[in-house]
Amino acid sequence: MDGDGDPESVGQPEEASPEEQQEEACAEEANGGEERPEDDGEGEAAYLDELPEPLLLRVLAELPAAQLVQACRLVCLRWKELVDGAPLWLLKCQQEGLVPQDGPEDERDHWQQFYFLSKRRRNLLRNPCGEEDLEGWCDVEHGGDGWRVEELPGDCGVEFIHDESVKKYFASSFEWCRKAQIIDLQAEGYWEELLDTTQPAIVVKDWYSGRRDAGCLYELTVKLLSEHEDVLAEFNSGQVAVPADSDDGGWTEISHTFTDYGPGVRFIRFEHGGQDCVYWKGWFGARVTNSSVWVEP
């Protein structure tokens, strides 16, 4: 048995008889009691090292990315060059559907960074649509009657047609309501060298809306912060006036992309808020939902 079968499907070996045990003992004595050397894997490594580069790349591409970076590149100089090179990571990207199989091979130099960024790509904001009330949000300011989570479309509102999974929104009141989230990029899996050298694009998006029966104000502020929370880059929408509109009341997207922001970014602070313009008791202020922060490959 070569050990490649399913352990549960392999039968238990029968116990040797006393006569067979005696014969095995005699055979060991005849061999001088020498033990058979165990394969330490050097033979397999030597065999792999003899493979043509295209075949070796395909073998390496089957391994987990962390194992490639942490172990395989330490085996020898040739493997280090392959792991650090673009072809291996382009192949992994193609195998995992991150880029088309027949896509161009020379448009991007840093396929390793592209791979890791693509695998981590997700909305870094928690609870962007109010499914968990205000869970995940900090520095919450409850002006007027405070924030309230409402079901779409809400009174004098419209459905959110841009994403069918969005079912709720946050409604502000007759004085400024604000809330924020602070994203720890290193805790989310983005290491210092990647942030400082590659400086991947950071894309911020938010959606806001008013009511058809009341005008309102909306504002978005996003800051890129250092380890000590110094502001390294900032975007501010200013106060956006949303007029009452009996014919529309639709949702508007606001977005900003941070690039070339320099080394040292460790945190992202996302803050938005709103209020109404008529000072009516209740929740006639700006509505927000589907907020997002993405680190793009």
Swiss-Prot record:
Q: How does it sit in the membrane?
A: Peripheral membrane protein
Q: What is its main location?
A: cytoplasm
Segments forming domain F-box: 45-92
What spans are recorded as compositionally biased (Acidic residues)? 16-27
Domain FBA spans what residues?
114-297
List where in the cell it is found.
Cytoplasm; Microsome membrane
Q: Where is this region: Disordered?
A: 1-42
A GO molecular function annotation here is:
carbohydrate binding
Q: In its UniProt record, which GO terms are filed under biological process?
A: ERAD pathway; glycoprotein catabolic process; protein ubiquitination; SCF-dependent proteasomal ubiquitin-dependent protein catabolic process
Transmembrane listed as a keyword: no
Residue positions annotated to bind a carbohydrate are: R211, R212, D213, Y279, W280
Role this protein plays: Substrate recognition component of a SCF (SKP1-CUL1-F-box protein) E3 ubiquitin-protein ligase complex that mediates the ubiquitination and subsequent proteasomal degradation of target proteins. Involved in the endoplasmic reticulum-associated degradation pathway (ERAD) for misfolded lumenal proteins by recognizing and binding sugar chains on unfolded glycoproteins that are retrotranslocated into the cytosol and promoting their ubiquitination and subsequent degradation. Prevents formation of cytosolic aggregates of unfolded glycoproteins that have been retrotranslocated into the cytosol.
Assembly and oligomerization: Component of the SCF(FBXO2) complex consisting of CUL1, RBX1, SKP1 and FBXO2. Predominantly detected as heterodimer with SKP1; the heterodimer with SKP1 is not part of the SCF(FBXO2) complex.
> Protein name, please?
F-box only protein 2
Tell me what organism the protein belongs to.
Bos taurus (Bovine)
- Recite the lineage of the species: Eukaryota, Metazoa, Chordata, Craniata, Vertebrata
Gene that this sequence comes from: FBXO2
